[in-house]
């Protein structure tokens, strides 16, 4: 299906934040979405930022995605990026029961920082390609998502990827469904870093 030309001006920008424990595949999902490659090796991230023009439901937008640190030693940074996010992907690995149990911590922190009873989020069950290592069932994931009243999706960044584009696009759809009054609170000029770029370029990267 043909897509329309990318508009040059006045595109809405959505700040999407990917959170979760270290090693659950946050960077692999993000890199697969932006660069269409699978990175199999785990390299702890401090903070990576990406920009992309994309068309979702016949509407063009700029996705400004922050891939965050999962390591506990960087937990002090979390509130800062949570304040500026328009929506969040809470990622756990289906092979790591502890990462699933820690979802509640991220969910509660987001609501506390945002001072809201609800906020655009999606619960992401990653690494479903590793079925022989699976420790968290689909039903357990769905039950948790129902508890939080947020969507649930299962993903794999490994080629061929499963639901990677859909996950990011669905989060934008959730944000768009919010009532205008709530969205107005988030229209401040905030930045995660310095100069911006367009396209699918990674803007800043600090690797341990």
Curated annotation (Swiss-Prot):
Subcellular location(s): the record lists: Cell membrane
- The question of whether Hydrolase is a record keyword is answered with yes
Q: Where is the lipid attached (S-geranylgeranyl cysteine)?
A: 205
SMART domains for this protein: RAB, RAN, RAS, RHO
Q: Which GO terms describe its cellular component?
A: plasma membrane; protein phosphatase type 1 complex
Q: Which PANTHER family match?
A: RAS, DI-RAS, AND RHEB FAMILY MEMBERS OF SMALL GTPASE SUPERFAMILY
Q: What is this protein called?
A: Ras-related protein M-Ras
Natural source organism: Rattus norvegicus
Question: What is the taxonomic lineage of the source species?
Answer: Eukaryota, Metazoa, Chordata, Craniata, Vertebrata
